[in-house]
Amino acid sequence: MNNNWLGFSLSPYEQNHHRKDVYSSTTTTVVDVAGEYCYDPTAASDESSAIQTSFPSPFGVVVDAFTRDNNSHSRDWDINGCACNNIHNDEQDGPKLENFLGRTTTIYNTNENVGDGSGSGCYGGGDGGGGSLGLSMIKTWLRNQPVDNVDNQENGNAAKGLSLSMNSSTSCDNNNDSNNNVVAQGKTIDDSVEATPKKTIESFGQRTSIYRGVTRHRWTGRYEAHLWDNSCKREGQTRKGRQVYLGGYDKEEKAARAYDLAALKYWGTTTTTNFPMSEYEKEVEEMKHMTRQEYVASLRRKSSGFSRGASIYRGVTRHHQHGRWQARIGRVAGNKDLYLGTFGTQEEAAEAYDIAAIKFRGLTAVTNFDMNRYNVKAILESPSLPIGSAAKRLKEANRPVPSMMMISNNVSESENSASGWQNAAVQHHQGVDLSLLHQHQERYNGYYYNGGNLSSESARACFKQEDDQHHFLSNTQSLMTNIDHQSSVSDDSVTVCGNVVGYGGYQGFAAPVNCDAYAASEFDYNARNHYYFAQQQQTQQSPGGDFPAAMTNNVGSNMYYHGEGGGEVAPTFTVWNDN
């Protein structure tokens, strides 16, 4: 076993035990500061030399001193334990060496990162006299000697005597290191907690937008515009009034402009707006012709959809499962929402809401579309709420029937001259195959006017609406029928296709425009909305010439008459008004 690990001879002294310390640190730091080593000046014959060497963390092991005595008897190496004291925790005392070896030597190491040693000191005391080793030799050896990293059993056994003080020192260092780590971790946690914003506390009561009247929805992230209508505020009421919702917007600026427009409508040009008043000159002129509710409804329709519904129409929401559009109206059924149904398009749902609004709120209701679009009178008089299929039936029932201009009798009873209406013939088509008419399965509407006393032998007319009239108009020509005046027929009668269909005393006879006249075997005068097909075709001869009575007759907006002068054609007159 090599005991010359100090690098110089110890032969003058008898050595019974040798201690060797093993350090696992890769670097060695020597504090070379005057005054770091101390010895007892009161000792007469013994000199104790205190040499302080420091090693970096985590060991923090300090080899206190190597003492020797000038006496002849042998002495063991005294390895003084150390107690570590953090510079930040001066009040806490580390374990003392006298607790273990009964000595009074105490060494304080101020920091695990060894500094200049200005805040640390070594105090050594000995029982006997002796000389001190030269510090220069030890410093030179420590600088030149690498750290022994061999951790074998022999070194482990040799360092047993040092283990007590080393363990105490190491445990002290480890405890201080752990305490420092805990403190550092605590500071880090505190810093992270302080850096993390507390949403529930800091965001409470704070504005979510820099614009007036704009808030950011915390769930959807979209911006909503609203204003407070204080016109309905009661006396003594502490609230700001009624909140008017202006819609949801994707951009914060759009929501701010919606608020500005609504504020200008409610409070005039003297109100405070988010943007200059000069940017709203056109809108101010437009809003003069609208009420507050109508203008708010228009703002909602211009929005990018409500935050709680994906429709731009009032009272319309989209179902979250099947995606169909639902219509609801509020505050009509015991201050609750009334479900109006589910529709395929949002326009149909908006119409259902409008009908319900007109029914429950009258002419002052705010609707999605113009109120002239609906038959307001029929909706108000309807005993039930015409929504959906009922609304469609109501539209069909209230569809305006084409107006007719009646041919009236302007001839007085005393006048039997030929100046009055004698007879009339209608424009017809020649060379048209009648079988083509039966290929179109169209509906036949029978319009009639029972103005007076109709002859039972007169022909009855049925009219068919023909959508493909332009196919027949290509080969048409006008034919004036020359029907002689008969004495048995009064001058105020009207003849259609050679048949007398009316006599004196009736108010008139109407023929719808763009309809085809057919002779039918039977005709129900009370079947106004029934549909017919031609059942029988008849041909008759008239005194003026041969032409089919049941002909393809495209009655235009003109009718012609043949007067007594023979062959003279009077100016045309309107029989049917398309408007």
Curated annotation (Swiss-Prot):
Tissues where the protein occurs: Mostly expressed in developing seeds.
Cellular component GO terms, alphabetical: nucleus
Transcription regulation is among the record's keywords: yes
Broad class of the protein's primary localization: nucleus
Domain of life: Eukaryota
Function according to Swiss-Prot or TrEMBL: Transcription factor that promotes cell proliferation, differentiation and morphogenesis, especially during embryogenesis.
Protein name listed in UniProt: AP2-like ethylene-responsive transcription factor BBM1
This protein's encoding gene: BBM1
